[in-house]
Amino acid sequence: MTISNTIPITPELIAGHGLKPDEYQRILDLIGREPTFTELGIFSAMWNEHCSYKSSKKWLRTLPTKGPRVIQGPGENAGVVDIDDGDCVVFKMESHNHPSYIEPYQGAATGVGGILRDVFTMGARPIAAMNALRFGEPDHPKTRHLVSGVVSGVGGYGNSFGVPTVGGEVEFDARYNGNILVNAFAAGIAKSNAIFLSEAKGVGLPVVYLGAKTGRDGVGGATMASAEFDESIEEKRPTVQVGDPFTEKCLLEACLELMQTGAVIAIQDMGAAGLTCSAVEMGAKGDLGILLELDKVPVREERMTAYEMMLSESQERMLMVLQPEKEEQAKAIFVKWGLDFAIVGKTTDDLRFRVVHQGEEVANLPIKDLGDQAPEYDRPWRECGKPAPLPANLVAAPKNYGQALLQLVGSANQSSRRWVYEQYDTLIQGNSLQLPGGDAGVVRVDGHKSKALAFSSDVTPRYVEADPFEGGKQAVAECWRNITATGAEPLAATDNLNFGNPEKPEIMGQFVQAVKGIGEACRALDFPIVSGNVSLYNETNGVAILPTPTIAGVGLLPDWRKMARIGSANDGDKVIMIGLDGSHLGQSVYLRDVLDSREGPAPEVDLFAERRNGDFVRSVIRNGQATACHDISSGGLAVALAEMAMASGKGLTIDLDECKGAPHALLFGEDQARYVLTVPADVADFVCANAEGAGVPFRRLGTVGGDALVVGDLIALPIQQLRDTHESWFPDFMEGRGELAAE
């Protein structure tokens, strides 16, 4: 059958599909003829960064992905990690950045929908969600509109679907003015012996379309997600998908019910590049060809072309390879749930991806070259220069320490996120044990009296910009520390690597060095990367975002009754710092928000100290000796103490007389591998003796009690004043009140 080409393939059309001239030449060499318009769209979708990872694949292979608990690492819809008793946790984080900037509500909502599908495609029931959000500076004219839309979209979809949002991040910086970041995380629980993969097996088997009908929404979405923005941004609004969480809930239940029947050979959700990507991935992974008949695809719009059907990113859709004898049983399940079920093709043995529409073959391409043998680049990169050292004695001390602390806890980036997370259902399913606002979200595992999972998401972009290698290490270390601070054992992580244009050697250098740092930290902390996502070209008019390699992790609590919270201290408890005295002010929020400076190097991450100190803290919590615990990160010791006091409603009397160094470095330094513990007075000596025996540095800081945070003669702030300052920034900002400077 000859393939006729009705639309001329011009250089402008090729460039409009995000394909470079040498990539188009590669297509001509591969197929020996000019591609059809539909084929051009298929190559464009499969060879862009979003689907092929062509600029990042070389470096992602260097990450540690295996461990004693890892059941499934990268390459599937989500990672799978053993949590004992025949159960496993299935999780992943991925970005929906570009759509969320163009259409914040739907962009964020469908980001949540997509990540939930990745989890339940594997056979897991979602139990927790998180999101890491980055916006432009607060006084930028679009920021409030974007915050409102994204938060509503995340909440609207997650709440309706019925999954608790248990954690996340929200930060502001001028470098996100033109490209916000929406990184969505989901985790689910499955049986370890009942995981479903996307690799097709067997020739001549039916390829089945499941879920909602196909429309024109999202056509070209994957290509848009692999491009820089410019003034034509508003024209891209039609490429944003529209989500329906109630359909997705039905799809979840139908899929899990179908998976019980033994009918499913392979299953893949339709995400980026829709039907194209899901069909190609299933076939290429299984070394099979796929034949699709588009006339059988359920559509909700008239006169859709083959190009539109292949590249539509309509939501709530799945593709499956089915046991033929179970067809009627499978169809009955989907009809019961009010969803479409259509056999749209079959597996073949010719390694071709063939598409037929209205009796005409509109695509006939080598499937491996679209899938796992797509182009891969070793892009040129250069190391980033590092800022000069910044000794603490060269950094000005505040005139008023109490005022400086209030400035930090009431700033755009350190203030309470209550306004955000109160719009999310944090309690649905009835298993949430720790809600947003602490170090990590904690969710009980259904059916077990004591087992729970801890979740955290972290990155400090200002560190990554100053030193991508140390910043990559720090993102992993802080995530590991936040999980540890609940008493959980960190099991594994997922990464969401957000960067600018990889064709610029300095941006590619940030990426390469951050990945090297992430890899080193994951190896040192036994914290493998089991899934992830890369989002490149986050630039507008040549201005790149801050490099933002978000790390989300999962930890296991064998007994949640012994977990620690940040606000559970009792009157009379002793306050102990684990780790060294603060000394590092480079790239600190004190420097940025109080002194309006971005100088100095990122703090160094001593991974041996992280491991030693964290393992000790976890043992104290699991032995039932800690009443509260908090890791020390942005804002240093002062902000950590303030957050613990605000969370517990109990004052702290702190004495720094034994500490060595300048007071502003002790209080606001952001040295790593540090925690604040509170322990009952009668076990304080025992805990300190154990720390000494384990070679863990510690400092006795003071006592819990009263209604104020008192630090020597430097700070004396009533908890209520701290709370009022901490809680007011976000509502004031969203209602357009007060001073809204980000810095």
From Swiss-Prot:
Is GTP-binding one of the keywords? no
Q: Does the keyword Methyltransferase apply?
A: no
Subcellular location per UniProt equals: Cytoplasm
Where, by residue number, is the active site? 50, 96
Cite the binding residues for Mg(2+) 2. Answer: 118, 269
Which segments cross the bilayer?
A: none
Which biological process annotations from GO are given for this protein?
A: 'de novo' IMP biosynthetic process
Cellular-component GO terms for this entry: cytoplasm
Main subcellular localisation: cytoplasm
Which UniProt key words apply to this protein?
ATP-binding, Cytoplasm, Ligase, Magnesium, Metal-binding, Nucleotide-binding, Purine biosynthesis
Could you say which residues bind Mg(2+) 1 here?
A: 94, 533
**Enzyme Commission (EC) number:** 6.3.5.3
Q: Which SUPFAM superfamilies match?
A: PurM C-terminal domain-like, PurM N-terminal domain-like
Q: Identify the metabolic or biological route this protein is part of.
A: Purine metabolism; IMP biosynthesis via de novo pathway; 5-amino-1-(5-phospho-D-ribosyl)imidazole from N(2)-formyl-N(1)-(5-phospho-D-ribosyl)glycinamide: step 1/2
Catalysed reaction(s) here are: N(2)-formyl-N(1)-(5-phospho-beta-D-ribosyl)glycinamide + L-glutamine + ATP + H2O = 2-formamido-N(1)-(5-O-phospho-beta-D-ribosyl)acetamidine + L-glutamate + ADP + phosphate + H(+)
Q: From the UniProt record, which GO molecular function terms apply? A: ATP binding; magnesium ion binding; phosphoribosylformylglycinamidine synthase activity
Please state the span of the N-terminal signal peptide per the UniProt entry.
none
So which domain of life are we looking at? Answer: Bacteria
Q: Binding of substrate: at which residues?
A: 95-98, 117, 241, 313-315, 535
For this chain, the annotated S-S bridges are none
Residues holding ATP: 53, 92, 495, 532
Physiological role: Part of the phosphoribosylformylglycinamidine synthase complex involved in the purines biosynthetic pathway. Catalyzes the ATP-dependent conversion of formylglycinamide ribonucleotide (FGAR) and glutamine to yield formylglycinamidine ribonucleotide (FGAM) and glutamate. The FGAM synthase complex is composed of three subunits. PurQ produces an ammonia molecule by converting glutamine to glutamate. PurL transfers the ammonia molecule to FGAR to form FGAM in an ATP-dependent manner.
| Family statement drawn from the similarity comment of this UniProt entry | Belongs to the FGAMS family.
What's the protein called, per UniProt? Answer: Phosphoribosylformylglycinamidine synthase subunit PurL
Q: Which organism is it from?
A: Rhizobium etli (strain ATCC 51251 / DSM 11541 / JCM 21823 / NBRC 15573 / CFN 42)
Name the gene that codes for it: purL
